[in-house]
């Protein structure tokens, strides 16, 4: 299906930089933190990742939208990125799985987007000055002054608890495994065929994380972010998972307190992304806001224990501060881009976490064995509990 683009759009950063381009989504105005992602593929997974809440995503790869969109390559029930910035939208979306071109997909989800701007220049600005607020305005009556005022009024993500905004309203079971080339997404796995009972805190969970847990025999119950530890422990889980999510981890007092209560037991804990940061905070460490964060599918990470390198998918603007880690936490992984902390393991509890995204979507599968380590801890816990 050919895409027809006729409307204008503009992007204004809080430092006053203005880009003019073509509207590729809904009309209107969108304000958020502008970040850049270096992934070549997976734009639909990126858009539907709840971790991008209140963020406008710049995709550095020049051609975005080649394969259109479909109803399977999603990480949540809707689009969470509040805006999209790309260099070029191909006129034709071509894939045997394509159901809707990217522009129409953005319109259907009321997402404002802009194309035909110099994304290399924009990325350099974000690298040099750091992630900053921005405003995309699309449609008629474009107003640079109004857009700049809107960008400057954005409060920023530091101090912002977004997990409570994107979490589920009520608990639900998840028993669906990973997508397959033959058959697509499978039907739910029967509960009796799943060996391990895992409770997953939803701080903005990606569905592929849940799929990979099911692939390893986990009967997953997803619970709201503010679920007390007492309710989780009353379910007698074999393990507790702490999900990814958006925003600053430090304001999430409810999550930190719940994790601290669970840590008093010997229940295995596995955290990813925001869950990693929350585990660090619950253990006594601190977190910090990064200059422009890590967003991409090609980030090298050192596995300290094994002495090898993993290529990983990353999406975070905050990080656990290694200098503040208590004595009972050992560092397991570090970024080879900037040396930032990527993984931790408690020495006195069966709890560990990883800053990147071992479930990928998009990205490589080098870090997928972290899910297997979670299962190993669960097996050990079950044996000791007998």
UniProtKB/Swiss-Prot annotation:
SUPFAM superfamilies linked: Carbamoyl phosphate synthetase, small subunit N-terminal domain, Class I glutamine amidotransferase-like
Annotated binding of L-glutamine, by residue: 51, 245, 247, 274, 277, 315, 317-318
UniProt xrefs under InterPro entries: Anth_synth/Amidotransfase (IPR050472), CarbamoylP_synth_ssu (IPR006274), CarbamoylP_synth_ssu_N (IPR002474), CarbP_synth_ssu_N_sf (IPR036480), Class_I_gatase-like (IPR029062), CPSase_GATase1 (IPR035686), GATASE (IPR017926)
CPSase: region residues: 1-196
Catalytic activity: hydrogencarbonate + L-glutamine + 2 ATP + H2O = carbamoyl phosphate + L-glutamate + 2 ADP + phosphate + 2 H(+)
BP terms from Gene Ontology: 'de novo' pyrimidine nucleobase biosynthetic process; 'de novo' UMP biosynthetic process; glutamine metabolic process; L-arginine biosynthetic process
Presence of keyword Transmembrane helix: no
EC number(s) recorded for this UniProt protein: 6.3.5.5
Gene Ontology MF annotations: ATP binding; carbamoyl-phosphate synthase (glutamine-hydrolyzing) activity; glutaminase activity
Uppermost EC category: ligase
Active site location: 273, 357, 359
Keyword list, A-Z: Amino-acid biosynthesis, Arginine biosynthesis, ATP-binding, Glutamine amidotransferase, Ligase, Nucleotide-binding, Pyrimidine biosynthesis
Alphabetical list of CDD domains matching this protein: GATase1_CPSase
Classification via Pfam families: CPSase_sm_chain, GATase
Location of the Glutamine amidotransferase type-1 domain: 197-384
The protein's annotated pathway: Amino-acid biosynthesis; L-arginine biosynthesis; carbamoyl phosphate from bicarbonate: step 1/1; Pyrimidine metabolism; UMP biosynthesis via de novo pathway; (S)-dihydroorotate from bicarbonate: step 1/3
GO cellular component: carbamoyl-phosphate synthase complex; cytoplasm
HAMAP family given in the database record: CPSase_S_chain
Family: Belongs to the CarA family.
UniProt subunit comment: Composed of two chains; the small (or glutamine) chain promotes the hydrolysis of glutamine to ammonia, which is used by the large (or ammonia) chain to synthesize carbamoyl phosphate. Tetramer of heterodimers (alpha,beta)4.
Functional summary from the UniProt entry: Small subunit of the glutamine-dependent carbamoyl phosphate synthetase (CPSase). CPSase catalyzes the formation of carbamoyl phosphate from the ammonia moiety of glutamine, carbonate, and phosphate donated by ATP, constituting the first step of 2 biosynthetic pathways, one leading to arginine and/or urea and the other to pyrimidine nucleotides. The small subunit (glutamine amidotransferase) binds and cleaves glutamine to supply the large subunit with the substrate ammonia.
Protein name: Carbamoyl phosphate synthase small chain
Organism for this UniProt entry: Shewanella oneidensis (strain ATCC 700550 / JCM 31522 / CIP 106686 / LMG 19005 / NCIMB 14063 / MR-1)
């Amino acid at each position: 299906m050919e895409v027809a683009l006729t409307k204008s759009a503009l992007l204004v950063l809080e430092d006053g930089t203005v880009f003019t381009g073509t509207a590729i989504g809904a009309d209107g105005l969108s304000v958020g933190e502008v970040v850049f992602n270096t992934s070549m593929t997976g734009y639909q997974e990126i858009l539907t990742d709840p971790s991008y809440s209140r963020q406008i995503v710049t995709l550095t790869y020049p051609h975005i939208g080649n394969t259109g969109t479909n109803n399977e390559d999603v990480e949540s029930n809707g689009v969470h990125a509040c805006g999209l910035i790309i260099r070029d939208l191909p006129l034709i979306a071509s894939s045997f799985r394509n159901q809707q071109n990217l522009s129409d997909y953005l319109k259907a989800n009321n997402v404002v987007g802009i194309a035909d701007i110099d994304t290399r220049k924009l990325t350099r600005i974000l690298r040099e000055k750091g992630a900053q607020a921005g405003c995309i305005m699309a449609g008629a009556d474009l107003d640079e002054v109004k857009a700049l005022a809107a960008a400057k009024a954005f409060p920023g993500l530091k101090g912002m608890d977004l997990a409570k905004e994107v979490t589920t309203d009520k608990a639900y079971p998840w028993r669906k495994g990973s997508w397959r080339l033959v058959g697509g997404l499978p039907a739910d796995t029967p509960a009796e065929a799943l060996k391990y009972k895992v409770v997953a805190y939803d701080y903005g969970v990606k569905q592929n994380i849940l799929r990979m847990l099911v692939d390893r025999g986990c009967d997953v119950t997803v619970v709201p972010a503010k679920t007390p530890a007492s309710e989780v422990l009353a379910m007698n889980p074999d393990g507790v998972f702490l999900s990814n999510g958006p925003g600053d981890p430090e304001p999430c007092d409810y999550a930190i307190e719940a994790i601290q209560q669970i840590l008093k037991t010997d229940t295995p804990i596995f955290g990813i992304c925001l869950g990693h940061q929350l585990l660090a905070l619950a253990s006594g460490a601190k977190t910090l806001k990064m200059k422009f964060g890590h967003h991409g599918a090609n980030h090298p990470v050192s596995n300290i224990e094994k002495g090898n390198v993993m290529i990983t998918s990353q999406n975070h603007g905050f990080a656990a501060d290694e200098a503040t880690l208590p004595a009972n936490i050992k560092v397991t992984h570090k970024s080879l881009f900037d040396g930032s902390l990527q993984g931790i393991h408690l020495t006195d509890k069966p709890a560990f976490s990883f800053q990147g995204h071992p479930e990928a979507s998009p990205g490589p599968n080098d870090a997928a064995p972290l899910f297997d380590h979670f299962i190993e801890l669960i097996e050990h816990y079950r044996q000791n509990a007998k």
